[in-house]
Structures are given as structure tokens and as C-alpha cells.
């Protein structure tokens, strides 16, 4: 199976300057910053300390039906966890590997602008990279950033509304990331 740029599914390559796909790459990687900003908490909030305390593992999956307050719970946890947290509000538009990982990197850069630099250089290189290689480089960026002077030793990442993601390449690359998740990253998927 081939992507629209002619590469096999699961591979990313930066388009050449003459490639008409360059415009679609720009459209795919540009996104409103509201996607990486957590929603405001309601004024009248029922605190759920017992639930927020359960979000303590390196990776936490929150599963509940729509309307049960997952987003509010994660936002409450974010405000009280004591570390900077990047936020991704996913929707059906993010169900493409390039768009998904671009959004994740943009969110992480709200916490630390140096995160994702290797990823960006791979994206714009002339040779295609597998999603696995890109995810490994993102992991390495997070580890290097946490070792830098004055760096946050731990950061969080919330992937909210992950149920919109159906693309097998995203699931596979996220699984690869989970296998190599840096100890300084706390990932919450809802």
C-alpha cells in the first residue's frame, strides 16, 4: 500500500521543493495552538483526589464512556501533579501519522522548545525515515533535554480523546514509543 507521496505506508519523507505534496505537508503539520492547550477547568469542580492519585504510573490509560469527565480529571491531575504537562486534544483530523506526531511534538515544545529537534530534522531530510526511527529520536530528545542544566526532570504528556485515532501506523509507532518511553516522561492516554 502506498501513501499519496508514493512511499510505502509507515514511511515519511520530506517532499522535494518541486513536489506538489509540499503544500499538503504544510497543511498537515500546521495546527491551531488550541489543540495543545488544556481546556479551562470548570468553576464548580468536584475534586476527585482518589482518582487523580491513581495517575501515578509511567503510562496511564483512562477509559470511560463519553461525558464521564476524563478530560476534566486529566486537567485536574495536570494542575496538581507538580510537573509541566504537555497536552494534545486529538480529533479525527489527527488520524494520520505525520499529523499525529507533529501535534505531539508541538505539544512537547510548549514544555521545552528543544524537544523534537531530531524529529524535525528527520522530517525535512531527503531520506525517508520509518515512524519507529522518528519515535526513537523523539525519545532520545526527551532524555537529552532532561539531562540539560535547568531542565525539568520530569514532564507529562496527555493524549486526550485517543479514541479518534484508528490508523494502524499510529498505533504501532505509539507501541514502539511505549517500549522505549523515557523514565522522565509521564504519559496519560484517554
Describe every region a protein language model picked out.
Residues 59, 164-169, 175-190:
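Sensor-1/coupling segment of RecA-like P-loop NTPase cores
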Residues 12, 66-68, 72-155, 164-166:
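Conserved phosphate-binding/catalytic loops and adjacent sensor/switch elements of nucleotide-binding enzymes
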Residues 52, 139, 171-175:
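A short, noncatalytic alpha-helical element within ATPase nucleotide-binding/catalytic domains
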Residues 160-161:
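Walker B catalytic acidic pair
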Residues 87, 157, 187-189:
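Structural beta-sheet core signal
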Residues 2-25:
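Interdomain "pre-motor" coupling segment immediately N-terminal to P-loop NTPase/helicase cores
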Residues 62:
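Hydrophobic anchor at the beta1->P-loop junction of P-loop NTPases
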